[in-house]
Design a protein with these regions (language model features):
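Short amphipathic alpha-helix that is part of the acyltransferase structural core
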Residues: 1-45
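Conserved beta-strand in the GNAT
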Residues: 63-75
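A conserved beta-turn-beta hairpin within the catalytic core of GNAT-like acetyltransferases
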Residues: 76-87, 142-143
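Acyl-donor binding region in acyl/amide transferases
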Residues: 82-137
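Conserved catalytic-core motifs of GNAT/GCN5-like acyltransferases
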Residues: 122, 142-150
Length: 150
């Protein structure tokens, strides 16, 4: 099944988007992300414009009810058959009533549509990683790995 690279979901109704349609939302989200994390990553953090270009080039991007922007990619794990959808970023961009559990359901659905064996969400951009792990666990996600940075 073909799944467009850029997609908008409003109340479950999918609408394919062009790069030109999704780009302003992605650029604004990357500016917010950059401002939050520039102190932590310093010179290693891509500029907002660079990050937007990478995402627009490399990721599937879904805008859910104008509330959440999720970028994901297909990833293979060296130790497992098949592939998973891996969340590259999950950003709240609106103030509507979309629940985080709905975002997880969307990703599970996309995993099925892509033929993936599941999906993965990370905590790399969270300011409080322990809190985000607890939040994800409350929504039924299970921790499967720990990644340490040196």
């Amino acid at each position: 099944m073909f799944i467009p690279q850029y997609l908008r979901l409003d109340a479950g109704t999918p609408t394919p988007l062009t790069r030109e349609q999704i780009e302003p939302t992605v650029r604004e989200a990357m500016k917010i992300y950059f401002d939050i994390h520039k102190a932590d990553y310093g010179q290693w953090l891509l500029s907002a414009d660079e990050a937007a270009e990478v995402s627009l080039r490399d990721h599937h991007i879904v805008l859910i009810n104008s509330d959440y922007l999720i970028g994901y990619s297909k990833a293979s794990e060296w130790y497992a058959r098949g592939f998973v959808l891996t969340e590259e970023y999950l950003l709240r961009v609106g103030t509507g009533s979309t629940r985080l559990s709905e975002v997880f359901e969307v990703m599970k659905t996309f995993a099925l549509l892509h033929g993936a064996r599941g999906c993965e969400f990370g905590t790399r951009a969270a300011s409080n990683k322990a809190a985000i792990r607890r939040l994800y666990a409350r929504h039924g996600l299970t921790e499967t790995m720990t990644v340490m940075r040196c």
